[in-house]
Regions:
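Non-catalytic tandem-repeat scaffold regions and their flanking low-complexity/translocation tails
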Residues: 1-245
Length: 245
């Protein structure tokens, strides 16, 4: 990028790679050039000189990549700009000033990615919002306030993600819930209370995923169960080898 000597060089470079703006000599950087850069890659906003940052440039940047909101000056972060950013990328919620975070904005974010719940202020984590979040990402259960964790919410979460069972309070890990979890993914056996790990339960988990064998109590690892687990893992590896992708 050391060969950027003229306006033409700069324009050609940033049309290919917006973040190449970082290599453009300061005397060649104009608002027009910055607009081209952020239109190609919103994150190029990081390299726009402070004196050239305008509301228009910021809007173009966040529409291209919501996480460009990180580089928007605080005084230019408007409700409209933040909504555009979050619409483009839910994780942009992490760069929204606390005073601009609304229930509507949070709902837009978690409908895209459940884990965006981690950026929602706790006082805005309502039962409805938490349910939407875990429907999209069961592991978002980790971000649900303790007082809002219900059996229904846990059931939705474990149906969506094997990892969700790790976030379920021990007192809510019922045989029924754990059964649903291992049916979704046998490796969820890792977070099943030992008291519930019966021979039948472990067999069901290993049949679902041979890798679950790792979390079967030693005293229940019979030769028959190990064989089933190994055969299941072998079958999966064969399927993977035959996949065209």
């Amino acid at each position: 990028m050391d060969n950027i000597k003229t306006n033409e060089d700069a324009l050609a470079a940033i049309k290919q790679k917006g973040r190449a703006l970082s290599y453009v000599p300061k005397e060649l950087i104009t608002q027009e050039l910055c607009l081209v850069a952020v239109n190609q890659n919103g994150l190029a906003l990081e390299y726009v000189p402070e004196g050239l940052i305008t509301p228009e440039i910021c809007m173009v940047a966040v529409k291209q990549d919501g996480e460009a909101l990180e580089y928007v000056p605080q005084e230019l972060k408007t409700p409209e700009l933040c909504m555009e950013a979050v619409n483009q990328d839910a994780y942009a919620l992490g760069w929204v000033p606390e005073g601009l975070i609304t229930p509507e904005l949070c709902m837009v974010a978690v409908k895209q990615y459940g884990w965006a719940l981690s950026y929602v202020p706790e006082e805005l984590r309502t039962p409805e919002l938490c349910m939407v979040a875990v429907k999209h990402d069961g592991y978002a259960l980790r971000c649900v306030p303790e007082g809002l964790i219900t059996p229904e919410l846990c059931l939705v979460a474990v149906k969506q993600s094997r990892w969700a069972l790790s976030c379920v309070p021990q007192e809510l890990k019922t045989p029924e819930l754990c059964t649903v979890a291992v049916k979704q993914n046998g490796r969820a056996l890792e977070w099943v209370p030992k008291a519930l790990k019966t021979p039948e339960f472990c067999l069901a988990a290993v049949k679902r995923d041979g890798g679950a064998l790792e979390w079967v109590p030693k005293e229940l690892k019979t030769p028959e169960l190990c064989l089933i687990g190994w055969l299941e893992q072998y079958r999966v590896s064969l399927d993977a080898d035959e996949s065209p992708f």
